[in-house]
Structures are given as C-alpha cells and as structure tokens.
Amino acid sequence: MNVVLSKSALENVSKHKYSGIDDSILAKLILQKYWNFCLKFVPLNIAPYLITLTGTITILLSFFIVGYYSPYLEGTLPRWVYAMSGLTLFFYQTMDNLDGKQARRTGSSSPLGQLFDHGCDSIVCTLQSLIVASVANYGVGYISLIQLFITALLPFWMATWEEYHTGVLHLGPINGPDEGIIIIVCALLSTAIFGNAFWTFKPFVASSQLLPSIIQQWLPTFIQQLMLNEIIVASLSLPCLITCFFNIKNVVQHLQAKQKPILPALKHILVWVIITVSSFIWYYTSTNLLPLSSIWFNNIRTVQFSIGIIFGELVSRLILAHMCHEKYNIIQAPLYPLILSTFCSTINYFNGTIIIPENLLLILFTVTSFVHYSLFVKSTISQLCSYLNIKCFTITKKH
C-alpha cells in the first residue's frame, strides 16, 4: 500500500540522526578491523544502498538453493550447500557493516540508509532462520516456529521497539548481529565438514549408561528423547527472552525519566504477539484438520517467508514512524492477510471440513503480502529520495 508522508513527517526525517551503540566484544577485538580492511577495496563511487542490496540478494540466493534441496526443512543436503550457506551469511554480515562505513566515507549518509539497511535486515532475519532450519533438520513442526518467532523475530522487534522509544539502537557485549551470526556461520561450516547427523543426535540417550539411575528416573521421557537441535533452540530462547527483558527495562527507565506514560509503549509489543499467536493458531488448525496435505507441510517455506515479509514491513513502518516522530498504530494493514488467513483456517477447523480451500488461501496470502510490501517500499523510497534530493543506488554529488 502506498504510504503518503506528510510535510511535517518529511521535515522530521530530514532532521533525523541515527544513533547506535555496538558494545560487541568480538566486533571491537576482531570484526571492526576486518571490516575496515575490506572497506579499502570498495570503490568510492559505489552507493551504500547497493552494498546493502548485494548482501541481501546473496542471502536470497542461498535461501532458494537450500530450499531446492530441502523444501520441507529436513533431509541431508550436499556438503557444498552447507558451506555455501555459511559463507553467504558471513558475506552478508560483511556487507551489512560496510554500507554504513561507505556512507560515512563518501558523505552520503541519510535517514533512508537506516531504513533501507534495517528493512533488509528484517527480511534476512526470516530467510536465514529458514536456512538454518533446513541445515539443522528442524522439519515442519513447532520447533521451527519457535526458532523463527522466539530466537529471530522477537529480538529484532524488541531492539527496534527500544530504538523507537529511546532514540538509540543499543547492541550489547554479546549480540545477534555480531557474535550470533559468527556462531551460526561456524555451525553451518561445521555441518559442511562433519555432515548434519549431529543435529539429530540424542545426547541424553547416548549418555544413558553414564548417568546415575536416579537422574534417569528423574528426567521426563520427552527430555531424554530431545535431539541436539531441539536443545539448542531451547538454550537460545532463554538468552533471547532475557535480552528482551532488558529492552523493556531500558524503555521503562527512559520513559520514567521523561515522565511519559509506559503502557502505550508496552502495547507496541502486541504487534509481535499478534504475528506469533496468529501463526501458531493457523499452524495448529491447518495441520490438525489436514495432517498430510496442510499448506504448512507442503509449502512451509512459502508460508513462513510470507510471514517474514509482513514482519519486515511492520518493522520498516516502526523505523519510519521513529524517524518521522509519528505514533505507531498496533493494528496495521500488513497484518490483515495473516489475521484473515488464520480466521479462515480456524473456520475450516471448527467445521471439520474444507470450506475455504487452503491452496487458494495460500495464493491470496502470499500475493497480498508481497504486493503490499512492494508498494510500501516503492512509495517510501520514492518520497524520501525526492524530498532528500538523493538517488537510491547512485551517490548524489553535493553542490
């Protein structure tokens, strides 16, 4: 949907200055030196947005290649595919950090750069989550949903939400964009070397002979049967939730210092809640009514990617609202396709029969999500470029 920015909104955007703090230990010790070294090889006439887009396209290609070999998020892939997925992610991280450096080096920094960069990041978040799900053999199930919504989308939303209210994007000493990506890269490359069998390894079963009988009796059966990939998702969920707690703490302290109401700010978290709850309900109703032919089984990547597109637009709208100094509404148009699809699937479930064909539902959901997001991107970039007197993919000479 086209977004019409008011004159006051555009004026606020033109005055916006990005404020970010990266306390990453790894970045300070190693990565910053590596990125500065790479920057020397980037020609001065290359636009920062082009660097951002190049990294995003690389992840998109990786997503399609992995999807070709693993359409259902499981199975053994060729070793080169694992290696490719790790190297493309590392390349993306490099590009994601070079764009800002290139903008400052060429004097082409602009508010559009922040929106474009973080907007691409929000899409990559879902793409990379699905790539990891295939490599780690998550398959179609709640484990892949938890991995996407809890360990990927939630931290991204909360960090952006904190920035909206405090004006600062603060990354901690150990964070996802730096340490998190390097850990994933190492995991992907390790899979290329050793194969993917270790992801489905059951450590409690393998160590049953070493565990005292009292511990074996105490451990519930479902825990004893946990695979390594499931243990990893559970282990990653906890620090993600802790990080979100500190996001909330920082916002509350900031608002209290400014003597502003807290509840309206907390309501913005409902956007992530709506996306997550709707997706889980849709998955449950669809897979229980159609155990073998559900679109969540046959088209899991398409469904989750479309949800990621919706998430990406909502994140971009939050960033835009922050730059425009405007209020952010909880219920917005990008949510409608997901809410409607969940509603239709729920009707099918409670009627015990297919009233609304799922294939039709999938087509409408996917097309609507992509078209809506595309129009938003086109409209927003066009208006910002026009008002700021810049071009998106070429560096505008300043007079």
UniProtKB/Swiss-Prot annotation:
BP term (GO), one: phospholipid biosynthetic process
Main location: membrane
InterPro entries given in the database record: CDP-OH_P_trans, CDP-OH_PTrfase_TM_dom, CDP_ALCOHOL_P_TRANSF_CS, CHOPT
Protein topology in the membrane: Multi-pass membrane protein
UniProt keywords, alphabetically: Membrane, Transferase, Transmembrane, Transmembrane helix
Entries under Gene3D superfamilies matching the protein: 1.20.120.1760
Transmembrane segments: 46-66, 76-95, 139-159, 181-201, 226-246, 262-282, 303-323, 330-350, 352-372
Cellular location(s): Membrane
PROSITE patterns: CDP_ALCOHOL_P_TRANSF
GO cellular component, as recorded: membrane
Molecular function, one GO term: phosphotransferase activity, for other substituted phosphate groups
Pfam families per record: CDP-OH_P_transf
Family indicated by similarity: Belongs to the CDP-alcohol phosphatidyltransferase class-I family.
The protein's name: Uncharacterized CDP-alcohol phosphatidyltransferase class-I family protein 3
Organism: Dictyostelium discoideum
